[in-house]
């Protein structure tokens, strides 16, 4: 079980720009969800692609693709 961690979930309102899976991936609006208390908050984000991993099959723009789940850098981690 993951405790006291903040994760960034790609929201349907997010702007997703992926340059051949390299460099920086940008989100215009992102949703942070605390795994411990399930509180959520929105903010813009800019996260290096190397922190990404594919979690589940979904469709964001009408094309089958994977939802991106981004682990937040410990230096910017937030606690409840």
UniProtKB/Swiss-Prot annotation:
Acetylation among the record's keywords? no
Localization recorded for this chain is: Membrane
Q: Which GO terms describe its cellular component?
A: membrane
Record keywords, A-Z: Membrane, Transmembrane, Transmembrane helix
* Signal is among the record's keywords: no
What's the protein's topology in the membrane? Single-pass membrane protein
Q: Which residues form a coiled coil?
A: none
- Give the protein's recorded name: Putative UPF0377 protein YMR324C
Organismal lineage = Eukaryota, Fungi, Dikarya, Ascomycota, Saccharomycotina
């Amino acid at each position: 079980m993951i405790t006291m961690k903040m994760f960034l979930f790609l929201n349907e309102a997010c702007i997703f720009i992926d340059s051949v899976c390299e460099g920086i991936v940008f989100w215009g609006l992102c949703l942070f969800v605390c795994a411990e208390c399930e509180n959520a908050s929105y903010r813009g984000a800019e996260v290096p692609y190397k922190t990404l991993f594919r979690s589940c099959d979904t469709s964001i723009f009408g094309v089958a693709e994977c939802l991106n789940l981004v682990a937040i850098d410990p230096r910017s981690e937030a606690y409840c």
